[in-house]
């Protein structure tokens, strides 16, 4: 029997934990010695769930849906689908296809709920479907004149295509200039802090993909057909049902971490990697720092990194070269320059627990609450008059996220900013007052007296951005690929705005078959810039 291969995984988010489990499951502990280094005390990265005074807050909102059925099956093996109605299912008389033999969410905690997606856009004090559609409600809210202008604008875009060398042109080609100016221009600038004309079209190629007015119309037509469509046939932004853990996405990743430890993975928290040491063209060890500033070196055969590319490059031989190794040296100056220029958008979410909503449920969708609350999971605030980018109503994600789900409403306000700017540096008291004032101006609540409790969370490097030195990513990728035993995975590890399922599929632990959709996506993105390839951890797998 050969010696075990030692694998060091940097990061306990979706990509890192997926890699750890895929390596260690089914007797993998006999082949691999796996260590996960997580820089915080929580698991799941941006997919974690924050607990506050009996209520739970989902950081960013995470629907469990994938076009890859293997990912869906993977989630289901961690948290089985509900086999009985949840609290709100029973109270509202909702029907779902229950999983035969599945757990009862009223009596068991390890369970995945089936949820109905409702998301809308708030613009000019009106609600529109999300993604934007040509529904009667949309046409009524826009009015006849604006609808005609938007319609002719879209027709023009069908026959006069712009070069897709930036995100602005990408959107105009799919929605027309009028709808772009209404719903995409200001919101994109709010999200990224840059005008869409300054952002690479790569972001649209990856995140928007097949979404367009024609895509929306096609989806509406297909919904009228009796044939049930598979996940792969539905544009991700248009899905109507998704899965969601009883206690939020963090519950799933906490369960995966627990399973990993039980199977033999060594997991270290408060272990922030500060140096990556190389010897003779390969990574030989990493140095991590604990919460008290103590540093420890950990050697390995293979290294899987989900830490931000900027931090990874700066960590390479950060303390100086090993004098006994000829080619042990820090990253070249030009690579460091590219890495340091990679932009990120940081994120602040403010949770507000309120007594009532001023906003009324005018839909036909039944909801909890007294009076019944609006049915939205998300409300996208496209209106440029507000800084908040998106609202989450946690009651509608899972009734088990809210301590008193019948008599209180737990809302998350999502703000995009940059670490160190004036909004990021606001005190929790001031940012809470600001959030309350925005909800009041939007007429979501009556005023400050409605607020019972609040909580602020700040997230660094939440969104890898597609401008500045991003255009030189191919050079940085080539440099990192030169380390034959280093594999960059996940959203920040690849500097790619992945969904959670994409981060899992590109986990670096074992080669996964690329389905047709992924191949098409890769081709579209590579028209603009080479992306990090999927690679197998050849030696340990």
What are these regions (language model features)?
Residues 2-15:
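Beta1/beta-strand and adjacent pyrophosphate-binding region of the FAD-binding site
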Residues 24-52:
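Glycine-rich FAD pyrophosphate-binding loop
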Residues 53-158, 209:
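Dinucleotide-binding Rossmann-like beta1-alpha1 core, especially the glycine-rich loop
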Residues 245, 271-429, 434-443, 479, ...:
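Mid-domain catalytic core of redox enzymes
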Residues 21, 25, 258, 314, ...:
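Short, well-ordered alpha-helices that flank and scaffold nucleotide-derived cofactor binding pockets
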Residues 136-138, 142, 146-279, 284, ...:
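Active-site/ligand-binding neighborhood in enzyme catalytic cores
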Residues 15, 42, 310:
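Conserved Rossmann-like nucleotide-cofactor binding loop
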Residues 48-49, 131-132, 372-377, 386-541:
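Conserved flavin/dinucleotide-binding core of flavoenzymes
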């Amino acid at each position: 029997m050969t010696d075990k291969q030692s694998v060091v995984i940097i990061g306990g988010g979706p990509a890192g934990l997926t890699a750890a489990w895929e390596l260690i499951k089914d007797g993998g502990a006999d082949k691999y010695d796996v260590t996960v280094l997580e820089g915080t005390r929580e698991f799941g990265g941006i997919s974690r769930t924050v607990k506050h005074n009996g209520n739970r807050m989902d950081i960013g909102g995470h629907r469990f849906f994938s076009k890859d059925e293997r990912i869906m099956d993977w989630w289901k093996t961690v948290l089985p689908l509900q086999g009985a109605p949840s609290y709100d299912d029973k109270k509202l008389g909702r029907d779902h296809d229950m999983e035969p033999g599945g757990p009862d969410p009223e009596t068991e905690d390890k369970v995945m709920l089936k949820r109905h997606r409702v998301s809308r856009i708030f613009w000019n004090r009106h609600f529109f479907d999300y993604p934007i559609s040509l529904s009667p409600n949309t046409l009524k809210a826009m009015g006849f004149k604006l609808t005609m202008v938007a319609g002719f604008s879209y027709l023009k875009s069908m026959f006069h295509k712009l070069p897709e060398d930036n995100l602005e042109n990408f959107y105009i080609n799919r929605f027309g200039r009028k709808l772009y100016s209404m719903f995409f221009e200001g919101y994109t600038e709010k999200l990224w802090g840059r005008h869409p004309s300054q952002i690479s079209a790569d972001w649209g190629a990856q995140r928007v993909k097949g979404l367009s007015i024609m895509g929306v119309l096609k989806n509406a037509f297909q919904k009228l057909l009796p044939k049930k469509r598979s996940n792969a046939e539905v544009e991700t932004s248009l899905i109507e049902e998704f899965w969601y853990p009883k206690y939020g996405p963090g519950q799933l990743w906490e369960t995966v971490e627990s399973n990993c430890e039980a199977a033999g993975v060594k997991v270290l928290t408060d272990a922030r990697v500060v140096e990556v040491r190389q010897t003779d063209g390969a990574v030989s060890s990493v140095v991590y720092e604990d919460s008290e500033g103590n540093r420890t070196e950990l050697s390995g055969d293979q290294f899987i990194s989900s830490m931000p590319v900027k931090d990874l490059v700066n960590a390479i031989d950060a303390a100086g070269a090993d004098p006994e190794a000829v080619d042990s040296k820090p990253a070249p100056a030009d690579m460091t320059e590219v890495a340091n220029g990679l932009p990120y958008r940081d994120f602040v979410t403010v949770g507000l627990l309120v007594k009532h909503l001023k906003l009324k449920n005018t839909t036909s969708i039944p909801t909890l609450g007294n009076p019944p609350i609006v049915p939205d999971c998300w409300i996208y605030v496209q209106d440029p008059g507000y800084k908040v980018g998106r609202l989450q109503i946690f009651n509608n994600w899972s009734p088990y996220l809210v301590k008193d789900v019948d008599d209180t409403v737990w809302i998350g306000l999502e703000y995009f900013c940059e670490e160190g700017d004036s909004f990021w540096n606001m005190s929790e008291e001031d940012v809470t007052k600001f959030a309350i004032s925005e909800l009041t101006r939007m007429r979501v609540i009556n005023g400050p007296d409605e607020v019972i409790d609040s909580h602020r969370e700040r997230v660094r490097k939440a969104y890898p951005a597609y401008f500045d030195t991003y255009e030189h990513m191919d050079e940085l990728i080539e440099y990192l690929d030169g380390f034959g035993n280093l594999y960059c995975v996940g959203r920040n590890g690849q500097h790619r705005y992945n969904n959670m399922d994409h981060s899992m599929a590109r986990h670096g632990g074992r080669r996964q078959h690329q389905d047709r959709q992924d191949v098409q996506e890769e081709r579209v993105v590579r028209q603009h810039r080479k992306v990090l390839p999927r690679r197998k951890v050849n030696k340990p797998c």
